[in-house]
Amino acid sequence: MAVRVGINGFGRIGRQALKALLDRHTDDIEVVAINDLFDTATNAHLFKYDSNYGVYPGDVEARESSFVVDGREIAVVAERDPGAIPWKKFGAQIVIESTGLFTDATKAKAHLSAGADKVIISAPARNEDITIVLGVNQERFDPARHNVISNASCTTNGLAPVAKVLFDRFGIQRGLLTTVHSYTNSQRLLDVASRDLRDARAAALNIVPSETGAARAVGLVIPELQGRFGGMSLRVPTSTVSIVDFTAVLDREATKDEINAAMREYSKDSMLGILGYTEEPLVSSDLKGDSRSSIFSGLDTLVVGNLVKVLSWYDNEYGYACRLSDITAFVARQLNGKTSANGSILKEIVGDPGMWGKNPRLRDRDSAASTTATATSKE
């Protein structure tokens, strides 16, 4: 029986999360309601037409108090107070909290009071019961104790799998992260007054140094690394796809081949669908729509003794939304008491993304474009 899910906040991540849920988890999950303050027609339009990922190929219909996606009707409400959202009426067992406003679990718990059993926050959180990065620490989830769960940030999901491989195989004494991150809606289109004078500047015209807690957050999912990492962000003029630039001092010397071999091995086994591996000379747009948390670039590994620098790509919107959908399915299976016969519940949920990890709609679109281009070149 599918677990019923509600979404609070239908912005960039909320919309991509719904697409990912519909692409990946219709057997485990039924999305029954969305709470958002914008009108239904606007939300349906923005779901259908996306500047980063193109036009949703299915049917989308806006109604007065719901919208219908591919024949599935989803109720829509508009409540400012999460405690006033009628989750109980809709039977929502899990709520995805993606407004960005209720990242403190003391506030997010209002969803529980409104009838939900579990809340998954699509951001780094405070006072949460547990932070989970799939592929790294999901085995620590206890459905009896953990009711408010953080999916961490897109950058923590991009770094943590890479850090885990390095830590498991070589040990890590300390590390520094720079995430070269696409701009987001929190930034300014043009210069405007702000207390943060860098954040005041036009996002599409500048490289903007900024803070990130992603490196420190790795210690939440790999406790042995608590306090060993620091980091910063460089916001750049691209609309999606970012890259982790991670420098670490290892416990022992390693070679480029050893590090790449370890990443390749994990990407094909315990982190299949989470960690990707490539030695292709890719650029950021090549990774748009990739469903994996982190795609390691073996071409760029640098080593000097026990000092290493590695790069790993991630689609900070769709890739993160896929993990958000996957962790929702993971929690849903726990609520239903489902276990895997061979213990590989994560592999069943995430699946094998294939070489590129593209979602089916984007993969089919790109294949069609490639076929058309080939045919044109022969004419």
Predicted features, each with a name:
Residues M1-A200, L302, D326, Q334-K338, ...:
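N-terminal Rossmann-like NAD(P) cofactor-binding subdomain of oxidoreductases
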Residues R4, D23-P86, G171-R174, T179-V308, ...:
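C-terminal substrate-binding/catalytic lobe of Rossmann-fold NAD(P)-dependent oxidoreductases
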Residues N157, E253-A254, Y318-G319:
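A generic structural signal for alpha-helix starts
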Residues S291-A369, A373, K378-E379:
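NAD(P)-dependent Rossmann-like dehydrogenase/reductase catalytic/cofactor-binding core
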